[in-house]
Amino acid sequence: MITTNKALFLDRDGIINIDRGYVSQKEDFEFQKGIFELLKHTKTLGYKLLLITNQSGINRGYYTLKDFEQLTEYLQESLLKELGFNLDGIYFCRHAPEENCACRKPKPSLILQAAKEHQICLERSFMIGDKESDMLAGLNAKVKNNLLLTQNPLKTPHSWIQCKNLKEMIDWIK
């Protein structure tokens, strides 16, 4: 398989939008400060934009698959209106942690599926997220560059870069 493309794998809640816990309605969805600039920067550099998100609220009964699909449609329409493009792919896990599925981050299967479908070279790509599970999913998939958005730096033996805001992430992505 030819893997010529590079990707920005990104988490949704906490990266694209402010994480208010189980966000499922557009009224509760607020874009994170700096996300438009980050997406525009990476798209200009030729990165595929691939959403990798755990959405256990579906199987926990907090919202329906249809709610998730409608919010995703709103997200895509908003990006198209604001930036002139939208995400290249959306990959999600609907399972709760106790279901012990194969797709929930920190397991790498969603990233690997997206990489296969979009011919992604993981060594030229980035995973960005706001939780340790996001970073571990990137590491487990062998994504070379992992950027963690955090106000409280973690002491970790892992090779991810910790950033205080999305603007700082832009500086790392070349």
Curated annotation (Swiss-Prot):
Question: Which gene is transcribed and translated to give this protein?
Answer: gmhB
Tell me the keywords, alphabetical order. Answer: Carbohydrate metabolism, Cytoplasm, Hydrolase, Lipopolysaccharide biosynthesis, Magnesium, Metal-binding, Zinc
Protein name, as recorded: D-glycero-beta-D-manno-heptose-1,7-bisphosphate 7-phosphatase
- Which domain of life, per UniProt? Bacteria
Q: How does it assemble?
A: Monomer.
**Which sites bind Zn(2+)?**
93, 95, 101, 103
Question: Which catalysed reactions does the entry list for this protein?
Answer: D-glycero-beta-D-manno-heptose 1,7-bisphosphate + H2O = D-glycero-beta-D-manno-heptose 1-phosphate + phosphate
Q: Which Pfam families does the record cross-reference, listed alphabetically? A: Hydrolase_like (PF13242)
GO CC, any one term: cytoplasm
Give the record's family classification: Belongs to the GmhB family.
Which residues make up the annotated site Contributes to substrate recognition?
Answer: 104
Q: Which compartments is it annotated to reside in? A: Cytoplasm
Chief place where the protein resides: cytoplasm
